[in-house]
């Protein structure tokens, strides 16, 4: 009888322990808050020189053995693979698996990898550690696992949905971006990944962020699909005051496009991961800011309260706009951030950095709060990031949007029908949208336009575009001082009804 009681008690204790134990963001937050109260310890590299000094071509030879993917022997649709350290990925991160009853460290082993022609001493790498990880999921076909998430380097992560290829990146946090003091790059130093059940359609990842002046706890819930959505919860703590905090940062690349054509002959009409910043302001206004590759660092700030969303988008999916069979810019996703709750007063900020080639990410966008708490106090931000190729879904259906911005030499048609340049710059902006397409072509659509002190609008005309079933704005402007930037805004209206988002363009200096 006593034995039966003991067994019953043991079973009850096991059930109670299993049901009550659960890993959560609060467990990570305790570590982050504890770190914030201590001095920063820079990560130490344990990387042998053969890996630290290798070239990119050599690093590419180190491949994960797909047959050894983590969870390969489980029926879960998600699998994990890991990145080896090498080049500037020279600091290990800890990766843990969270099960229903415990947390287990996923240990590095060189047996996970094939090294190609890279010569190395096996004894020097046996305890090396991983540089990061990737998540695989049968997103495009049921019998094939495709990579959908990559977490590698600082606090960067890339995500794609069905039929997409990697393009822009998201980050956990940005600090002092574009400030003279220099940017600080926080890094995820440890991850906890929940083991999914066979029927799970989402994967939960926790991360501990650390940097000289900030720490943070993050929870990412990845929901793969045609649009892959990542639900993000973050708890951030400052060690010291910072000049600027970038929340939900997105990083992309813009080299050239029709608003800023390539200075050299190139068979590709456009080359970019994103071509504009879209903002849904707290007051309901939609704003579209075409991207530039300026000759000097450019920072644009859009002040508002409680933003409803922002993102770096790739508008225009026709292959003919890119003509690149290797890099398939037409398949790269847009990323849209939707805040949860009220974020208060602050700005959506856009940073554009000069670059000579497509290998450098030169575009950054993020939310920066006006007020930051004292060091040690907790900041909470919740939001989703949608990675999509369906830009129509990322905009209000009753509001027309900018399909494309083209830049040209301004001219005037002479009596002999020959066009004569007149010293102006012309911008041709096509607007389209589901509701706009329903309007009769004789609708008296006009434009509300404005320009900053450094320019003058010489002419502004709007006409129906029968090809797009939208309206085309042509605006000729004269710049007063080419060494300064020139700001322009335009929106289409019908009497007192606003029909479109606001086109907000900055002509870079020395263009």
Curated annotation (Swiss-Prot):
Family to which this protein belongs: Belongs to the OpgD/OpgG family.
Stated name of the protein: Glucans biosynthesis protein G
Keywords for the protein's UniProt record, in alphabetical order: Periplasm, Signal
Free-text function comment from the UniProt entry: Involved in the biosynthesis of osmoregulated periplasmic glucans (OPGs).
Pathway: Glycan metabolism; osmoregulated periplasmic glucan (OPG) biosynthesis
PANTHER family: GLUCANS BIOSYNTHESIS PROTEIN, GLUCANS BIOSYNTHESIS PROTEIN G
Organism: Escherichia coli O8 (strain IAI1)
Keyword presence, Signal: yes
Signal peptide residues on this chain, from the entry's feature table: 1-22
Cross-referenced HAMAP family: MdoG_OpgG
Pfam families: MdoG
Cellular-component GO terms for this entry: outer membrane-bounded periplasmic space
Localization annotation: Periplasm
Classification via InterPro entries: Gal_mutarotase_sf_dom, GH-type_carb-bd, Glucan_biosyn_MdoG/MdoD, Glucan_biosyn_MdoG_C, Ig-like_fold, Ig_E-set, MdoG_OpgG
One Gene Ontology MF term: catalytic activity
Name of the gene: mdoG
Keyword Zinc in annotation: no
One GO-annotated biological process of the protein: beta-glucan biosynthetic process
């Amino acid at each position: 009888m006593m034995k039966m009681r003991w067994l019953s008690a043991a079973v009850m204790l096991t059930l109670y322990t299993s049901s009550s134990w659960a890993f959560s963001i609060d467990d990570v937050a305790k570590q982050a808050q504890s770190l914030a109260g201590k001095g920063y310890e820079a990560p130490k590299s344990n990387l042998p020189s053969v890996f630290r000094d290798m070239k990119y071509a050599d690093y590419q030879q180190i491949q994960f053995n797909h047959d050894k993917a983590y969870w390969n022997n489980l029926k879960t649709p998600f699998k994990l693979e890991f990145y080896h350290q090498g080049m500037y990925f020279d600091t290990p991160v800890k990766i843990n698996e969270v099960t229903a009853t415990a947390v287990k460290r996923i240990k590095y082993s060189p047996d996970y990898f094939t090294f190609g022609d890279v010569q190395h001493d096996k004894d020097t790498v046996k305890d090396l550690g991983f540089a990061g990880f990737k998540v695989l999921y049968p997103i495009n076909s049921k019998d094939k696992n495709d990579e959908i998430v990559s977490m590698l380097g600082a606090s960067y992560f890339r995500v794609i949905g069905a039929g997409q290829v990697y393009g822009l990146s998201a980050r956990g946090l940005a600090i002092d971006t574009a400030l003279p003091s220099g940017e600080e790059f926080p890094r995820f130093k440890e991850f906890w990944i929940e083991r999914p059940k066979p029927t799970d359609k989402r994967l939960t990842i926790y991360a501990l962020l650390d940097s000289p002046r900030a720490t943070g706890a993050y929870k990412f819930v990845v929901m793969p699909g045609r649009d892959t959505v990542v639900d993000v919860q973050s708890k951030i703590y400052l060690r010291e005051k910072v000049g600027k905090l970038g929340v939900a940062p997105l990083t992309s690349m813009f080299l050239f496009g029709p608003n800023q054509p390539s200075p050299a002959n190139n068979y590709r009409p456009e080359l970019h991961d994103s071509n504009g910043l879209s903002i849904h302001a707290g007051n309901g206004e939609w704003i579209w800011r075409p991207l530039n590759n300026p000759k000097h660092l450019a920072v644009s700030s859009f002040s508002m309260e409680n933003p409803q969303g922002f993102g770096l988008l790739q508008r225009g999916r026709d292959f003919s706009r890119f003509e690149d069979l290797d890099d398939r810019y037409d398949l790269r996703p847009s990323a849209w951030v939707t805040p949860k709750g009220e974020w208060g007063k602050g700005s959506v900020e856009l940073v554009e950095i000069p670059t000579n080639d497509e290998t450098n990410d030169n575009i950054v966008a993020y939310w920066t709060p006006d007020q930051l708490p004292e060091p040690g106090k907790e900041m909470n931000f919740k939001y989703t990031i949608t990675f999509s190729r369906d830009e129509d879904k990322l905009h209000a259906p009753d509001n027309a949007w900018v399909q494309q911005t083209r830049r040209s030499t301004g001219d005037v048609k002479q009596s002999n029908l020959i066009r004569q340049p007149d010293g102006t710059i012309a911008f041709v902006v096509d607007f389209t949208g589901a509701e706009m397409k329903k309007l009769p072509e004789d609708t008296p659509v006009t434009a509300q336009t404005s320009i900053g002190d450094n320019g003058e609008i010489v002419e502004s005309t709007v006409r129906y575009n029968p090809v797009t079933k939208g309206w085309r704005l042509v605006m000729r402007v004269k710049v007063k001082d080419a060494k300064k930037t020139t700001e322009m805004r335009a929106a289409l209206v019908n009497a007192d009804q606003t029909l479109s988002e606001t086109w907000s363009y900055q002509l870079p200096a020395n263009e």
